[in-house]
A protein has these predicted regions:
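A structural signal for small-residue-enriched, beta-sheet-centric alpha/beta enzyme cores
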Residues: 2-107, 113-433
Length: 433
């Protein structure tokens, strides 16, 4: 993978690809290391370590697939309240690898804990021994291939030796690049806000381009904050905000075995203690976290495999959110809808089809459909002044908004997706060749 860093650091802004990279800098309590473990045929950074020298509170949400990767199993077995390290590898999903894949993670965790404990003794006034049970993993890549335990294990000393206690934009970007697979762009986002009167940072990176359909998080996403928040508060905040962000996107309707989104709190900013998420002091943080998650999830869609258009689907005035969500994803996951949009064909009949197959009862006399600001269906009827040429012209845009109004209540749901192009087929047909 050849990356032009000049293009990344000084990008030409494109709304579709969302490649305006933000200036993530230092966040207290987070250390980063990146290396090449030679997991790909051609050398590239493919192994990333986040090290929390004083530990970090954390929370995660994982895939709801009935077949999960070995790293998800490992992470679910971790009961430590604080995490000392997160290790992420690209190229290999460690899924459908069985006991051998799990034992590989155990070996890597044991090696990492020994070396990080040694580093603690070298660098800290009050060193602590680090346990393998304080290390979690993210894996992404091909399913079913033997996990490269030895290559990763041999790279751990290099990672530990290269740990950077102070970060800058380049280090964060290299970390985001290191976890990419078929992604074309690294995904980095930041927000700053206040808890009480204390300013805190929220940084996030993610990867994802294909095999994305929500059932919790739909990709790999990692959020870091210097705020002081408990595991319980982090868990509640993450689950609350994931539903309308990472759980609102789809590129191809396929749910991965490896999905995870995690949030880590280093506690370096001594903000007011938050006992529940209804505390007014956490309101700004909650909003900023939602912004980070939504921004990252939209970037995943915009960078979808072969994507040429970013599609927003708003289902409004529904009697409940569940129905709105089901209809939104029935449209978002329709290959006929997605190919029509790729071909810039104003075939609104495919939207009707997708609404109908959702299984939700529809009062046609109340149904309205808009493409952007152009009303197509009003109260179940094609509008009298409908001009297909006007809609066809709208379809040439890179961002397409579809609005479906059920007019049966006040609930709503927004889904985000991409078009389906020949390039998507090429990418996935050639994925392993």
């Amino acid at each position: 993978m050849t990356i032009n860093f000049k293009d990344l650091i000084y990008p030409k802004v494109s709304r579709l690809k969302m490649n305006d990279f933000q200036d993530l800098d230092h966040i207290e309590g987070v250390s980063i290391s990146i290396t090449c473990a030679n997991l790909y045929k051609k050398p590239r950074d493919d192994l990333v370590m986040f090290y929390f020298r004083d530990g970090a509170n954390y929370a995660s949400v994982y895939t709801q697939s009935k077949i999960v990767s070995e790293n998800i199993k490992w992470n679910l077995n971790i009961k430590s309240k604080k995490i000392k390290s997160l290790i992420i590898n690209a190229r290999n999903a460690n899924a459908f690898t069985g006991l051998e894949g799990y034992k590989g993670l155990k070996e890597i965790a044991e090696e990492t804990s020994l070396l990080l404990s040694k580093k603690q003794k070298e660098d800290e006034n009050y060193p602590k021994n680090i346990s393998p049970n304080e290390i979690i993993f993210g894996c992404t890549g091909t399913i079913g291939e033997k996990y490269p335990t030895q290559k990763i294990k041999e790279s751990i000393p290099i990672l530990v030796d290269k740990i950077k206690y102070t970060q800058n934009k380049l280090i964060w970007m290299k970390a985001a690049l290191g976890i990419m697979t078929t992604d074309l762009k690294p995904k980095l986002v930041m927000e700053e806000c206040e808890i009480g009167k204390k300013k805190v940072k929220i940084y996030g990176i993610a990867k994802g381009s294909g095999m994305i359909f929500p059932n919790m998080a739909t990709t790999l996403g990692y959020i870091f904050t210097d705020a002081d928040l408990s595991n319980d508060i982090l868990n509640e905040l993450l689950k609350k905000n994931i539903e309308t962000t990472f759980n609102a996107i789809s590129t191809d309707g396929d749910t991965s075995t490896n999905d995870m989104v995690s949030i880590f709190s280093t506690g370096k900013v001594k903000n007011s203690k938050i006992k529940n998420i209804n505390d007014k002091k956490i309101k700004n943080f909650n909003g900023a976290l939602h912004s980070v998650l939504l921004n990252l999830s939209k970037r995943v869609v915009a960078d979808g495999e072969g994507a040429s258009k970013f599609i927003t689907i708003n289902v409004i005035k529904s009697k409940n959110e569940k129905d709105a969500k089901k209809i939104a994803f029935s449209i978002a996951n329709s290959n006929l809808v997605k190919t029509a949009i790729a071909g810039e064909d104003p075939n609104w009949g495919r939207i009707i089809m997708a609404i109908g197959k959702s299984g939700i009862n529809i009062d046609l006399k109340k149904l309205s459909i808009n493409f952007g600001n152009i009303k197509i269906i009003d109260k179940g009827q094609l509008v009298n002044n409908y001009k297909e040429s006007e809609v066809a012209n709208y379809m040439k845009q890179q961002t397409i908004d579809i609005s479906v109004s059920l007019n049966t209540g006040q609930k709503k749901f927004t889904a985000y997706t991409m078009d389906l192009t020949k390039k998507y087929i090429e990418i996935n047909a050639d994925y392993r060749t």
